[in-house]
Amino acid sequence: VAPLLTACGGFLLAVLWMDLIFDSQSLRHRSSGGELPEPMLASVAAYYHRATTTSRPMSRLIALVMLILLAALGFQATRGQDPGWLLVTSAGLAGFPTMLALTQTVPDAIRLGRRDDSALEQSRLARSVCRDHLVCFGCMLAFVVLWVCDALAI
């Protein structure tokens, strides 16, 4: 099960990396708090329109991998072969980003992709999605590192 956990975590890291390629545009203007330049908003919004709406069924693959990751982690916990701290830490590192994506990041990305809001609100959404993705990337990176170190008995 550990190889499945690291594979799922690695896949999610790759997806986050792609998202961050677009999200990083908003980092150049993070201190202003105002509207992002229109070409930047258009780029980020177009990406999230494709990623959340027009890329189906591929966009559902990400949710499926999150579900597989959590199910595999639950199965691994029932086996009783891993230290409790590893399982609890892993549950937090995988569960928090999943819940954040479900409750905030994906709805914000969908709204941003629709471009129905004011430029100021779209800028806020772009910054929020970027912040969420940075947090999720850190969590998934730590998750993968934990399971790779465990597999290598480091």
Please place each PLM-identified region on the residue numbering:
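Interfacial loop at the N-terminal end of multi-pass membrane proteins
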Residues: 2-66, 114-126
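Hydrophobic residues within membrane-embedded alpha-helical segments of Major Facilitator Superfamily
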Residues: 8-12, 68, 93, 139, ...
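Membrane-helix exit/interface motif
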Residues: 24, 63-79, 104-107
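Individual transmembrane alpha-helices with interfacial aromatic-anchor signatures
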Residues: 55, 123-142
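Core segments of transmembrane alpha-helices
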Residues: 58-73, 136-144
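Short alpha-helical packing/oligomerization segments
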Residues: 82-107
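Transmembrane alpha-helical segments of integral membrane proteins
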Residues: 102-118
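Juxtamembrane boundary at the C-terminal end of a transmembrane helix
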Residues: 147-154
